Amino acid sequence: MTAAQVDDGAFLLDVREPDEWAAGHAPGAHHVPMMEVPARMAEVPTDAEVVVVCRSGGRSGQVTSWLMGNGWDNVRNLDGGMHSWAAAGREIVSENGQPARVL
């Protein structure tokens, strides 16, 4: 799925590391680092569209496959990750007081 195809109502699951998240993420995204997903999978809805994102699409692709293998059928990977999100002109916010950017 491309950044332009992501519906505003989608549950955006950002699986990047805390420093990547703090530097810049999509507004309203939910942060669960990749290695924490198995322990925190109850936070991921089964009744809404879920779009998984990382920096470039690799980690999010792995998480998408893992979720699908564990019962989620409403999960899509964001092709190109946050790099494609930013390139598409989608909004990015930061948590560290610096201008938002993709690490």
Give the positions of each predicted feature.
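Rhodanese-like catalytic fold shared by cysteine-dependent sulfurtransferases
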Residues: 1-11, 17-49, 60-103
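Short, surface-exposed ligand- or partner-binding patches at beta-edge/loop junctions that are enriched
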Residues: 53
